[in-house]
């Protein structure tokens, strides 16, 4: 188990970029709200601890984890955010519904990351039982929401740094190759 030997709430503030000027969106599923509220609290507290002003954190609720995709998409389109964290919890039941929801949410959030220029951080627990979710939302393994907030700060910083123009940056062709503008070289003879 990936979190068995790791506390999700631990981070070294000295390794995290300055986040005071970033603006974050958090989209929270209301399904399994005991868990998602714990995850939200972990994310919110970590952002505040990393100097993000509370007024620069926008929260939207959606009914369930599947709706996180649409909520995140609309937040990306309408809010001026540097990153979005999606928070949900899907717990294995007796049917295949768990598999469909987990796959759909995972692919939907992946698609948003591919299609947009703003990072969307995946904080959706997909556990076998309620105890595993409790353990990862402020329990014995810490809080996945905290980990997601730190990831959001780091990704917002990467986005910011990547947008800074450098003289060696060249536009890419649709094939992924560098587009290099040819400039004729004039050789003057004396």
UniProtKB/Swiss-Prot annotation:
The protein's Enzyme Commission number: 2.5.1.78
GO biological process, one term: riboflavin biosynthetic process
Keyword Transferase: yes
Disulphide bonds in the chain: none
InterPro entries the record matches: LS, LS/RS, LS/RS_sf
Residues at the active site: 97 (proton donor)
Molecular function GO terms recorded: 6,7-dimethyl-8-ribityllumazine synthase activity
Signal peptide: none
GO cellular component terms, semicolon-separated: cytosol; riboflavin synthase complex
Catalytic activity: (2S)-2-hydroxy-3-oxobutyl phosphate + 5-amino-6-(D-ribitylamino)uracil = 6,7-dimethyl-8-(1-D-ribityl)lumazine + phosphate + 2 H2O + H(+)
CDD domains listed in its UniProt record: Lumazine_synthase-I
Keywords, comma-separated and alphabetical: Riboflavin biosynthesis, Transferase
Sites where the protein binds (2S)-2-hydroxy-3-oxobutyl phosphate: 94-95, 136
Enzyme class of the recorded protein, top EC level: transferase
Pathway where this protein functions: Cofactor biosynthesis; riboflavin biosynthesis; riboflavin from 2-hydroxy-3-oxobutyl phosphate and 5-amino-6-(D-ribitylamino)uracil: step 1/2
A family per Pfam: DMRL_synthase
The keyword Transferase is annotated on this UniProt entry: yes
Residues that hold 5-amino-6-(D-ribitylamino)uracil according to the record: 31, 65-67, 89-91, 122
Free-text function comment from the UniProt entry: Catalyzes the formation of 6,7-dimethyl-8-ribityllumazine by condensation of 5-amino-6-(D-ribitylamino)uracil with 3,4-dihydroxy-2-butanone 4-phosphate. This is the penultimate step in the biosynthesis of riboflavin.
Entry similarity comment: Belongs to the DMRL synthase family.
Protein name: 6,7-dimethyl-8-ribityllumazine synthase
Organism annotation: Flavobacterium johnsoniae (strain ATCC 17061 / DSM 2064 / JCM 8514 / BCRC 14874 / CCUG 350202 / NBRC 14942 / NCIMB 11054 / UW101)
Gene name per UniProt: ribH
């Amino acid at each position: 188990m990936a979190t068995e030997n790791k506390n999700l709430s631990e981070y070294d503030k000295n390794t995290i970029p300055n986040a005071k000027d970033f603006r974050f969106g958090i989209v929270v599923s209301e399904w399994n709200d005991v868990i998602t509220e714990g995850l939200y609290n972990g994310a919110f507290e970590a952002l505040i601890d990393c100097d993000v002003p509370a007024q620069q954190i926008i929260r939207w609720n959606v009914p369930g984890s599947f709706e996180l995709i649409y909520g995140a998409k609309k937040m990306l389109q309408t809010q001026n955010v540097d990153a979005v964290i999606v928070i949900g919890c899907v717990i294995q039941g007796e049917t295949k519904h768990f598999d469909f929801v987990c796959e759909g949410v995972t692919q939907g959030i992946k698609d948003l990351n591919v299609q947009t220029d703003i990072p969307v951080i995946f904080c959706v627990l997909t556990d076998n039982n309620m105890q595993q979710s409790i353990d990862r939302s402020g329990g014995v393994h810490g809080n996945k929401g905290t980990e997601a907030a730190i990831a959001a700060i780091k990704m917002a910083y990467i986005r910011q740094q990547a947008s800074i123009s450098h003289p060696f940056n060249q536009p890419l062709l649709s094939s992924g190759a560098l587009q290099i503008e040819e400039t004729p070289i004039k050789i003057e003879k004396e």
